[in-house]
Design a protein with these regions (language model features):
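AMP-binding/adenylate-forming catalytic core of the ANL superfamily
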Residues: 95, 112, 379, 385, ...
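Conserved ANL (AMP-binding/adenylate-forming) active-site segment centered on the GW(Y/F)…HTG consensus within
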Residues: 354-356, 382-405, 436-441
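Conserved AMP-binding A3 loop
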Residues: 37-41, 188-214
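Conserved pre-ATP/AMP-binding loop-to-beta segment of ANL
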Residues: 21-24, 137, 157-192, 199, ...
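Conserved AMP-binding/adenylate-forming core of the ANL superfamily
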Residues: 26-58, 62-71, 75-79, 96-101, ...
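Conserved AMP-binding/adenylation subdomain of ANL enzymes
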Residues: 211-226, 233-298, 302
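Gly/Ser/Thr-rich phosphate-binding loop
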Residues: 272-276, 286-354, 450
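Conserved structural elements of the adenylate-forming
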Residues: 44-49, 184, 203-223, 230
């Protein structure tokens, strides 16, 4: 396979359709253990029909919101929107209706494509989004006043069939979506940051941002690899690496229908690759640990299947012990680093080139430097700005450089090392700067620590910990708070006084998290 870099999403989809037309592009469940598939040729055709339907509604170039779980109709909608010259605004399906409507108003949305499970959003949008002109339902039972996506696709297919029987076929073809050029530097997607603190911002990403980010590095993913997609579809990491990267190499994308059924769906779809956040990886690690003592190949077959070989991890810090654990079963865990503002990958680890403690090597289309300890990056993946937020854009971008807000540096070979977030820095009474993430990462290596948040409280450093009760029970720990204090005391012995944790708080519940499973910090 000759590897190529693409500059528009439309190029990726066209390449996939031309090269892998009869291969399965998407597989999804239609019952407990039944699967249906759609080919690359089918999704290419359906997305073109949807592009044409959008144009006939007068919405070409419009901002179109997408609200739904990962599904075949969601993918058809997204490709139909961006390949037809409009702007997709994917939103978190789990957000309250009021918040979704606010985001649609802020993004100047004039058309909404929505899943049937959010009929409450349809009602709210009709009442509170005056600019909204059309609502299209992706489901089988559209709410009152909604257009049916299925009917729009069928009608457009019929229109094309009629046109192609007439003598003006060539003239008509000139006006179809398939002949229209897409500007690589045109805005195509607005993604709202989930944000661990503060107001979410609409990140403006161009065709080039997304297409080049997904394809600028040949990660040696085999053609037609089977990928199980478990991350939220509105999340940049899923969109770029599961979908766009997957389409560029002809992968079969299998849709996980629930986070409660990941283990079952691994057995059903038999994937080779998965993109995950550390919380998910830790959950699967427990299944491996529960089978300790059995031959590695037996355990791997039971949990993942013999064909499974790679996990890409991103979104948060991953305890290195888990990388070693999965390696014993012949599974590579490759870490990456990125942010929505970079579409989203900045650096990634590949199996043949790794360095201890690094989050990965810069992508070929990216350069980085450290300014006063903060990592700045520049390249074709960097956003054009925040939608209608000029002050925030000016604060984030300087001469093409994106200020990541992360504390870190890059070595001579382009490997990135992180120490924390600039905005989370704790300034001690004697003027020392302490990165809470640095402390959190060290404490997280202890199995009794399920989740931890470090902050300043009344002039001292405090660690709030949600313990791993399952591990405590398994290992016979009766006094969990006392054992956690021992962990804190052990940590304190090895660090300077200004980095020591002087207060421990034990939680009874998990921390609230963002859609990408990051712990929410206080404003």
């Amino acid at each position: 396979m000759e590897y190529r870099i693409y500059h528009t999403i439309k190029e990726i989809v066209k390449h996939a359709e031309d090269t892998y037309g009869s291969c399965d592009a998407v597989r999804y469940k239609t019952g407990k253990d039944t699967i249906e598939a759609k080919t690359y040729r089918q999704i290419g055709k359906d997305s073109r029909h949807f592009s044409d339907a959008i144009e006939k509604l007068g919405q070409r170039g419009a901002h179109i919101a997408l609200i739904g779980v990962t599904s075949y109709p969601w993918l058809v909608s997204y490709f139909g929107i961006v390949n037809g010259g409009s702007v997709a605004v994917p939103l978190d399906v789990a957000l309250p209706a009021e918040e979704l409507c606010e985001l649609m108003r802020r993004a100047d949305v004039t058309m909404l494509v929505v899943d049937d499970i959010r009929k409450d959003v349809v009602v709210a949008a009709k009442n509170t989004c005056p600019s909204l002109q059309y609502i299209v339902s992706m489901g089988k039972e559209p709410a009152e006043g909604c257009l049916s996506m299925k009917e729009l696709l069928a009608q457009n297919a019929e229109d094309i069939r009629v046109e192609n029987t007439e003598s003006t076929r060539a003239e008509n073809a000139k006006g179809t979506d398939t002949e229209k050029e897409i500007d690589p530097d045109a805005l195509c997607t607005i993604l709202f940051t989930s944000g661990t603190t503060g107001k979410s911002k609409g990140v403006m990403l161009t065709q080039r941002n997304l297409a080049e980010n997904a394809t600028c590095l040949d990660m040696k993913i085999e053609e037609n690899a089977v990928i199980l997609s478990v991350l939220p579809i509105h999340h940049a990491y899923c969109l770029s690496m599961d979908i766009l990267k997957g389409f560029s190499v002809g992968s079969t994308i299998c849709i996980n229908d629930s986070l409660m059924r990941v283990a079952r769906n691994i057995q059903l779809f038999r994937p080779q690759i998965m993109l995950m956040v550390p919380l998910m990886i830790e959950s699967l690690a427990k299944k491996l640990e529960a089978a300790e003592g059995l031959p590695a190949e037996v355990v791997k077959e039971k949990v993942f299947g013999a064909q499974f070989h790679t996990i890409f991890s991103g979104g948060a810090y991953l305890n290195p012990d888990y990388i070693d654990l999965f390696a014993r079963y012949g599974i590579s865990v490759l870490q990456g680093y990125g942010m929505t503002e970079c579409a989203p990958v900045i650096a990634t680890t590949v199996a043949w080139n790794q360095k201890k403690d690094s989050v990965g090597q810069l992508l070929p289309n990216c350069e980085a430097k450290s300014v006063d300890g903060e990592l700045w990056v520049r390249g074709s993946s960097v956003m054009s700005g925040y939608y209608k937020m000029p002050e925030e854009t000016a604060a984030a971008l300087e001469d093409g450089w994106l200020k990541t807000g992360d504390l870190g540096y890059v070595d001579d070979e382009g490997f990135v090392y992180l120490t924390g977030r600039k905005k989370n820095l704790i300034i001690t009474k004697n003027g020392e700067n302490v990165s809470p993430e640095e402390i959190e990462n060290k404490l997280s290596t202890k199995r009794l620590v399920a989740e931890v948040l470090v902050r300043e409280a009344e002039g001292v450093i405090e660690a709030e910990i949600f313990p791993n009760q399952e591990y405590a029970t398994k290992t016979g720990v009766e006094d969990v708070p006392a054992k956690l204090q021992e962990i804190i005391d052990s940590y304190n012995k090895d660090v300077p006084a200004y980095k020591r944790v002087y207060r421990l708080k034990v939680r009874k519940e998990e921390f609230p998290k963002t859609a990408s499973q990051k712990i929410k910090r206080e404003n």
